A protein has these predicted regions:
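Bacterial N-terminal signal peptides that target proteins for export
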Residues: 2-14
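Acidic/polar surface patches and capping/hinge elements
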Residues: 32-532
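Generic secretory/membrane-interface signal
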Residues: 6, 19-20, 412, 498
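Short, flexible helical or helix-coil boundary motifs
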Residues: 11-14, 18, 152, 381
Length: 532
């Protein structure tokens, strides 16, 4: 069964690669005129989905770029476990590392230029060997990884040693690939040291802590007092030890961080969201509550697949994993992998910067509070919590499909970060490959984060009665036919989960795709050696 139909996403397929949301909002946006569009053949039968997400075949030989991306993803997951998932920060750290790798590689390409030193690192033709590329990439990855993840410096050193390199070789002698890699990384690091993200905690306005806010943001509302219902307010989580914690707005200053390809964070700022009391917002809130009460096993799986878990690499990491699928599918060379990962990593960083500028500008709340306000004192059908399925509750008790320790991401809703990042990354993948076709299948376990200890009958219970019409197996296969559809699914997962209203997602997808369309000629210019 086709994933889109099984999700009942209200999507109308108007061509092999272009999808429209119900209502007619064109999310594909305009295509750069110099890029030929080849939608390819969208897979129709489940048997045709032989590309399994995150499962390389026995004969697969990863390129050096693919291997270092694996190290980057693992380091990012370790950081998320240490600090909770921080999608803005993760997107930047990945872009820093992938840009360093690209710049080191470019020194050994015939035409490509780096982002910081242009063509000044170009090595003579006799030095442009595969081995030199791999060594330069390794040192660039190592230096930049230690910069962005200093708490894991020893672990990262061991990864470099395991690949046969000396982490104490800090040479910047350009006649050696070690020197090229170190020099390329040092230039990117210096450029990003004070880029508005406040990584070191020493930028004006911060409190001295890494990545601390530099803008003095304070929420209009508190968990105990609503001053303005449209505005964001912290949500109390379980701390896992019997108490509660109400995290503040994660990196509210992120719109001030320096983007890669965008001129300004507000360059494509979306229009204002629907306001409190409007028919549009009322409709969006009712939709969230209705969907929450009727989640299928497949829909729950989609929520968790796109959310990832405690070891999350964020949407940047997730889309880089999709890019790895493409690498395996298309039998990429090292050169292709370096360029693809560089483009995906940077467009997602820019997407988060633009998204956070919108979040800070509009400062909107989340369904967690809005549903409770609108349906307070009313009995509604809703998800009752792990293993309870659908039950009737007072509207003031409504909650998303999520564990108690992470009910909703701690930042405003408009626009959705998942949707914005997915819109950008999916479009770059389409432009890079020349086709919207993806053709992957993700094999997941339903409820593995939220309801791991319950049977499918308990998960799908209704009013206290276990379901008798669901399969015993929790295995769900999610079919991802196109990059566009995968982005739509990522956005829809936030509505199904109860973290966002539809408007957050629709405008996020549009924003992300505008960013990608604007950025693509810049990436191509770096590849072609014509970047200024």
């Amino acid at each position: 069964m086709n994933l889109l139909s099984s999700l009942r996403l209200s999507l109308t397929i108007v061509s092999a690669g272009a999808l429209l949301l119900a209502g007619g909002a064109d999310l594909a946006a305009a295509q750069p005129p110099d890029v030929a569009k080849d939608t390819g053949q969208v897979l129709a039968s489940p048997r045709e989905y032989t590309l399994v997400h995150r499962m390389p075949g026995p004969d697969f030989k990863p390129t050096a770029a693919y291997q270092w991306l694996e190290v980057l993803l693992e380091a990012s997951g370790r950081d998320a476990e240490r600090h909770r998932p921080r999608p803005t920060i993760l997107s930047r750290t990945m872009a820093v590392v992938l840009t360093s790798m690209y710049d080191a590689w470019a020194a050994y390409d015939d035409v490509a230029v780096g982002t910081r030193l242009a063509g000044r690192l170009r090595r003579p033709a006799r030095q442009r060997t595969q081995s030199n590329k791999e060594t330069a990439i390794a040192y660039a990855a190592y230096r930049s990884l230690v910069f962005v993840y200093p708490e894991d410096a020893e672990w990262i050193r061991n990864r470099l040693r395991a690949k046969g390199f000396d982490p104490d070789d800090g040479s910047t002698e350009l006649t050696t690939p070690q020197g090229v890699g170190n020099t390329a990384a040092n230039a990117v690091i210096e450029y990003r040291r004070h880029d508005g993200a406040n990584q070191l905690g020493d930028e004006p306005g911060g409190n001295g802590e890494p990545y601390s806010d530099t803008t003095g943001y304070a929420p209009k509302n508190t968990p105990d007092k609503v001053v303005d219902p449209i505005r964001w307010m912290p949500i109390p989580f379980s701390d896992g030890n019997g108490g509660t914690v109400s995290p503040g707005f994660l990196t509210p200053h992120w719109g001030k961080a320096k983007p890669f390809a965008l001129e300004r964070a507000d360059q494509f700022r979306p229009p204002p969201p629907p306001q409190w009391g409007s028919e549009a917002l009322s409709r969006d809130i009712q939709e969230v509550v209705r969907l929450n009460a009727n989640l299928s096993l497949e829909q729950k799986t989609i929520v968790e697949f796109m959310r990832e878990g405690p070891h999350s690499t964020g949407q940047s990491g997730h889309w880089l994993q999709f890019a790895q699928d493409v690498s395996r599918r298309d039998h990429h060379t090292l050169d292709q992998d370096v360029k693809l990962f560089f483009a995906v990593g940077n467009v997602v960083m820019d997407a988060f910067i633009a998204c956070w500028e919108a979040k800070r500008t509009y400062d909107t709340s989340r369904p967690y509070w809005w549903a409770r306000m609108v349906f307070k004192g009313k009995e509604i059908d809703a998800w009752g919590g792990p293993g309870k399925g659908m039950i009737k509750i007072g509207g003031e008790r409504w909650r998303p499909y999520s564990p108690d320790v992470f009910l909703t991401p701690p930042f405003p809703g408009y626009t959705s970060g998942h949707a914005t990042a997915s819109g950008a990354a999916s479009r770059i993948l389409e432009l890079f490959t020349g086709s919207d076709r993806y053709g992957a299948v993700a094999i997941q376990q339903a409820g593995y984060m939220t309801e791991p200890d319950f049977s499918t009958a308990e998960m799908q219970a209704r009013n206290g009665r276990p379901a008798n019409d669901v399969a015993e197996s929790k295995e769900v296969r999610l079919f991802l036919p196109t990059f566009t559809a995968t982005a739509e699914i990522a956005a829809m997962s936030r509505l199904l989960g109860g973290y966002h209203i539809r408007t957050d997602n629709d405008e996020g997808l549009i924003l992300g795709r505008r960013i990608a369309n604007y950025s693509w000629p810049k990436y191509r210019a770096y590849f072609a050696g014509t970047a200024k």
